[in-house]
Amino acid sequence: MKIYHGIFSECGPRRKNEDYIAVREMPEQVRSVFVLCDGMGGHHLGEVASKLVAEHICDYWTKNPKRKDSEKKIIDACNETMVAYNNKSRVEMGTTMAMAAIEGNKALLAHCGDSRIYVIRNHEIIYQSTDHVALTPEGWPIITRAFFTGSNSYTPDIKEIEVEVGDMIFICSDGVYGNGKWSALKDTLEGKDVYSYLLSSVEKIASEKAHDNYSAILIRICRDEPADKTDTYLFKLNRRLRGTDDEFEPIEYFRFRREAMDRLVELNCYSREKGTYQYGVTRYVDGNGAKWIKNEQQINDSDE
């Protein structure tokens, strides 16, 4: 299986962004880990807490490459995070955490707080994490599980699933689903939009009436090998383009549309430097090479 992912993290109406996303991809171990943290309002240095937790958990994965992914591995990573930073700082801070650790066809999903994880299969949400939230006597919601909040209630809920080709895992902070647009968000996640459009559609929904930072990771599980020679050509073309323009990171699992002998492939790319999405179209006639059009420049490719 091959994993594609895309992210966004925006400040919204707040003065600073306390959300943080960290990703580690380890193709030699057929393993990836994705962590999203949301620094808690009302605590000092929420942006510091979210970065510390996300980076430390990801670093734990890269420092322990031979250790199989497991519930205990997640708990050990969380415990090490707490020990490392509690020993360094007494400053009040807090953060939620939601993560996906994928190894082969197994995904471990873990969260504490109100950052959420969704699993979408065949255009249907088949799993949604449960928020760790309670109401005060006055009716205000409070987070009951988080890092660095002066209690030991940071142990995450952990769910193990077997992933299938076509599955998507969506991880987000509460700023994404908490703006009153849940119905539109759910329809989009379960809809039939091609994957390249999906992340930008979700980001647009999250930005409407945003009251908080909003961040998300969208992960797509794809097949390792293309199904036919035409698909093989497109995979090779994608690798060539990625190698010649490493500023752009493709996050799309290809969508094909046949028009007589022609094929049209639409590919979304995320520019790390510019923080924006770029849109490119590759069009080719079977057996006659390809043309890649991006940013009003056309590059001919006649490989195979």
Locations of the language-model features?
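Short, polar loop/linker segments at the starts of domains and inter-domain junctions
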Residues: 20, 249-252
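PP2C/PPM-type serine/threonine phosphatase catalytic domain
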Residues: 1-237, 241, 245, 257, ...
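A short, charged, amphipathic alpha-helix used as a generic interaction element across diverse proteins
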Residues: 242-246, 254-280
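Residue-level detector of beta-propeller blades
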Residues: 125-127, 250, 298
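Short, mixed-charge low-complexity intrinsically disordered segments
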Residues: 266-304
